[in-house]
């Protein structure tokens, strides 16, 4: 009897080849879809990373889209100067010039009646005089003692530009805007032949219960930490240090059974603010046991170790750490390029293609 295959055998071989081919195609397709979850405590820079993805991978914000952010820029600017003025009362700081007390009263009147998206020359003048006051600057230098947006000085220092009648926010202005994320914001983009689905989830405690809905099929988690938060307390709990809250949260995510096989990427963000702050505010505020110097390199490395040491599966799970400045497009582009290479490698491994 010869070794020739019967028609049925040939059909079976073809079917087997087709199944193998389909499995491989499915594997390759799965390897090209990336579900990224952006997690972290409130105000750690997650939404800014999402905005950067639009700038880097989706041709940025159109002029029309930038115009829509004018309302937010003005709101952030006004709320920042109001927060400083209110803090002066709590911290018992006097105005450098007594006449500024009248400006402060005028600020509250004008801010209360301001039309959305408009900044009158009268309101801009009041804010400008207040911001230049010595007492206001003294209070601003103590901003760790109250809640103040990171973008406060950025907008207030640029008041002449942003208060022009023909003002259109720049991409950088848009990046600096602060709007609390509620719910889940989904962004899609393509990069390095991969189709990314990025989910930005509100970081305040009240928003975290919504995270569970995003967990299924996650390729990688980008966990954002604001390095500059080491000497601040939470807006929602003034007894809790923000860095301690971030560590607690990272511990629960990093060691969660849901994420045993999920790549964890740690963004130690706001490195620019941290580099300035560490010169005047010691790391021992957050870590009393710290004995190193208050230099950027040593203090940042210590914080990195504090987070990486929370990983209880070091033998099987690697944490990929990057120092970032979410408002710096070039920095984010460079870091995200490296992150994508890690995702590609790990994704192909899981699909048996690496």
From Swiss-Prot:
GO terms for biological process: adenylate cyclase-inhibiting G protein-coupled receptor signaling pathway; cell division; G protein-coupled dopamine receptor signaling pathway; GTP metabolic process; positive regulation of macroautophagy. Residues 265-272 are annotated as: G4 motif. It is found in: Cytoplasm; Cell membrane; Cytoplasm, Cytoskeleton, Microtubule organizing center, Centrosome. Residues 196-205 are annotated as: G3 motif. GTP binds at residues 42-48, 150-151, 175-181, 201, 203, 269-270, 272-273, 325-327. CDD domains: G-alpha. Residues 173-181 are annotated as: G2 motif. Signal peptide: none annotated. Ubiquitously expressed. It is a lipid-anchor. SMART domains: G_alpha. It comes from the Eukaryota. Residues 324-329 are annotated as: G5 motif. Keywords: Cell cycle, Cell division, Cell membrane, Cytoplasm, Cytoskeleton, GTP-binding, Lipoprotein, Magnesium, Membrane, Metal-binding, Myristate, Nucleotide-binding, Palmitate, Transducer. GO terms for cellular component: centriolar satellite; centrosome; ciliary basal body; cytoplasm; cytosol; endoplasmic reticulum membrane; Golgi membrane; heterotrimeric G-protein complex. Residues 35-48 are annotated as: G1 motif. A lipid is attached at residue 2 (N-myristoyl glycine). A lipid is attached at residue 3 (S-palmitoyl cysteine). GO terms for molecular function: G protein-coupled receptor binding; G-protein beta/gamma-subunit complex binding; GDP binding; GTP binding; GTPase activity; metal ion binding. Belongs to the G-alpha family. G(i/o/t/z) subfamily. Heterotrimeric G proteins are composed of 3 units; alpha, beta and gamma. The alpha subunit contains the guanine nucleotide binding site. GTP binding causes dissociation of the heterotrimer, liberating the individual subunits so that they can interact with downstream effector proteins. Forms a complex with CCDC88A/GIV and EGFR which leads to enhanced EGFR signaling and triggering of cell migration; ligand stimulation is required for recruitment of GNAI3 to the complex. Interacts (inactive GDP-bound form) with CCDC88A/GIV (via GBA motif); the interaction leads to activation of GNAI3. Heterotrimeric guanine nucleotide-binding proteins (G proteins) function as transducers downstream of G protein-coupled receptors (GPCRs) in numerous signaling cascades. The alpha chain contains the guanine nucleotide binding site and alternates between an active, GTP-bound state and an inactive, GDP-bound state. Signaling by an activated GPCR promotes GDP release and GTP binding. The alpha subunit has a low GTPase activity that converts bound GTP to GDP, thereby terminating the signal. Both GDP release and GTP hydrolysis are modulated by numerous regulatory proteins. This is Guanine nucleotide-binding protein G(i) subunit alpha-3. It comes from Cavia porcellus (Guinea pig).
């Amino acid at each position: 009897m010869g070794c020739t295959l019967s028609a049925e055998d040939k059909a079976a071989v073809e079917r087997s080849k087709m199944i193998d081919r389909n499995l491989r195609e499915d594997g390759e397709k799965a390897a090209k879809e990336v579900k990224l979850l952006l997690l972290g405590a409130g105000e750690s820079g997650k939404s800014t990373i999402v905005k950067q993805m639009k700038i880097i991978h989706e041709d940025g914000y159109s002029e029309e889209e930038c115009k829509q952010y004018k309302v937010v820029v003005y709101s952030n600017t006004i709320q920042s100067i109001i927060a400083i003025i209110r803090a002066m009362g709590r911290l018992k700081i006097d105005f450098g010039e007594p006449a500024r007390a009248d400006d402060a009263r005028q600020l509250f009147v004008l801010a209360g009646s301001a039309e959305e998206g408009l900044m009158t020359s009268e309101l801009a003048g009041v804010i400008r005089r207040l911001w230049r006051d010595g007492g206001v600057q003294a209070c601003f230098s103590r901003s760790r003692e109250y809640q103040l947006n990171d973008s406060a000085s950025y907008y207030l220092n640029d008041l002449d530009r942003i208060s022009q009648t023909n003002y259109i926010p720049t991409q950088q202005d848009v990046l600096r805007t602060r709007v609390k994320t509620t719910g889940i914001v989904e962004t899609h983009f393509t990069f390095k032949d991969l189709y990314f689905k990025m989910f930005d989830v509100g970081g305040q405690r009240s928003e975290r219960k919504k995270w569970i809905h995003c967990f299924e099929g996650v390729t990688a988690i980008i966990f954002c930490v604001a390095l500059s938060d080491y000497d601040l307390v939470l807006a929602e709990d003034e007894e809790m240090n923000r860095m301690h809250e971030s560590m607690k949260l990272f511990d629960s995510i990093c060691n969660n059974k849901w994420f045993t096989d999920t790549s964890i990427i740690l963004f130690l963000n706001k490195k620019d603010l941290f580099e300035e702050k560490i010169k005047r505010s010691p790391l021992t505020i957050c870590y009393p046991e710290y004995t190193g110097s208050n230099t950027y390199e040593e203090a940042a490395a210590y914080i990195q170790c504090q987070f990486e040491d929370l990983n209880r599966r070091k033998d099987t799970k690697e944490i990929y750490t990057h120092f970032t400045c979410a408002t710096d497009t070039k920095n984010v582009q460079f870091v995200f390029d490296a992150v994508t290479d890690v995702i590609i490698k790990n994704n192909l491994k899981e699909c048996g293609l690496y």
